[in-house]
Curated annotation (Swiss-Prot):
Name of the featured protein: ATP synthase subunit alpha
Membrane topology category: Peripheral membrane protein
Binding site for ATP: G170, D171, R172, Q173, T174, G175, K176, S177
Species per Swiss-Prot/TrEMBL record: Prochlorococcus marinus (strain AS9601)
EC assignment: 7.1.2.2
Molecular function terms, GO-annotated: ADP binding; ATP binding; proton-transporting ATP synthase activity, rotational mechanism
Site entry (Required for activity), positions: S363
Record lineage: Bacteria, Bacillati, Cyanobacteriota, Cyanophyceae, Synechococcales
PANTHER family: ATP SYNTHASE SUBUNIT ALPHA, MITOCHONDRIAL
Amino acid sequence: MVSIRPDEISSILKQQITDYDQSVSVSNVGTVLQIGDGIARIYGLDQVMAGELLEFEDGTEGIALNLEDDNVGAVLMGEALGVQEGSNVKSTGKIASVPVGEAMQGRVVNPLGQPIDGKGEIPTSDTRLIEEMAPGIIKRRSVHEPMQTGITSIDAMIPVGRGQRELIIGDRQTGKSAIAIDTIINQKGQDVVCVYVAIGQKSASVANIVEVLRERGALDYTVVVSAGASEPAALQYLAPYTGAAIAEHFMYQGKATLVIYDDLTKQAQAYRQMSLLLKRPPGREAYPGDVFYLHSRLLERAAKLSDAMGGGSMTALPIIETQAGDVSAYIPTNVISITDGQIFLSADLFNSGLRPAINVGISVSRVGGAAQTKAIKKIAGTLKLELAQFDELAAFSQFASDLDEATQQQLERGKRLRELLKQPQFSPLNLAEQVAVVYAGVKGLIDEVPVEDVTKFATELREYLKLNKSEFIEEILKEKKLNDGLEATLKEVINEVKSSMLATV
């Protein structure tokens, strides 16, 4: 017979009372009614908020977008192969956030901030909301510092300033991404953090861009966010906001940042797909009514912060793809109206051999003039006008048989200016090299050089300056001004290079 010991029973009861966990966990749970095409209809989730993160049974995450009377429409951020009708869904009470910080530089991540480059986890504990309010008026100051792209035609005629939104627009295969990549490469040594967002692109293209950046030492200060063509529409829609959040972290630390959205046409198409599947009413070109807000809330996050806020900046270069040069379509006109200017790339100019194929006549920078360096502003003032007039005269001269001497001279000057502005890919020029090249063309110092030799002349001029006049380059890079002494030196060098070149022709 086992004896019952009261003290033992008492201690067991006390232990159980002590260990009793009386906390109650309340979770907001729903049931999947319907699933397909990356969209789930969920019954329940009465307490869910718009934009709240949801967690499905198999670990897939989603975002609640449509809050209707009897169900919730959510988009899935993954394949969701384990989700089916009747699956449980839990609201998390959180809004989508992404890891940020120094450790992100040099990495390739997906729109959720997860690494996809095979280099392991990213050692950072900082996070930031993907959707963040843009800085208010008081927190900003006007654009006043240059963001050098290294591309002469842009820095001279369509200058971009830190904190500006400059649209790159053109048909497919006209060199839009090339301009963006060149701009990233040109930030080497400038203490600028770059974020390249690839939306709906082929994985091979993104891998190629990453390799180009690595070869040129630009990946060290760049974060690549990739939502490939095979990714769900929800991830393609989120990718630009993720890029903006990563850049914002550095901007609020007082750093200069550059974000490239390549391209926002595909983001709008992904959003249209999601909206139509969620049965939102379609508008023009079947886009939903809030597609303008989709891009405006993204691009308004680019800013030049006031000194009180640390003086950081986020420069945005959104890219838009047009169909047969039609800039009056819905998305192009929306983004043109949001941004501070546009660089228009022409397929005709591209096919005629002009690279970068910038159409100077309809390209403009609305605020960049205030940020342009004095050295290039002084000499490039007439360049845009001369090239625009040349384009008109060139079209007119095809129909006119006898042209007066002044018109012929203007045509010849225009041909040489256009040749001077040709620039191979991945070879950005510094300020001093740009000043030298533009000065030679605008001042008419190369009018005697044959048109076919102008590109060769520009290369020789840059080489001569590097080898024999390094102090000229250093002075311009330091002072950012072209004084009378430097101008005399430059004129002398140009004439010397021209004479030696003409002697061998």
